[in-house]
């Protein structure tokens, strides 16, 4: 069974109801296939702070993510981070810090990253990436 780690931008699209692609995929996946991670939590909670009523936005994020399995940045992810960052630096293809942390968590836990930002994630060696925006 393929398990997915949705990047922050995929959740934002879902929360704003702007696209049906993410919603359609989520409707056909079992709850056990969809996961989250501490970095995505941090980014979504930070984004909630930008709204007029941040408490309401945080509640929406919690209702959405709390039922999902959560992966933290642990030692296995740290090892993947070190290898990936070294390879990216050597190739001159740096990606954003949070994206690399998310990618490392996905690699450590055999997850496929779902993101609208596939160009950046596809630079990470060995990472499986899908774009559900269409």
Spans of features found by a protein language model:
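Histidine- and aromatic-rich ligand-binding microenvironments
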Residues: 7, 37, 94-96, 117-118
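A generic structural signal for short hydrophobic patches within well-formed alpha-helices
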Residues: 11-12, 41-44, 78, 121
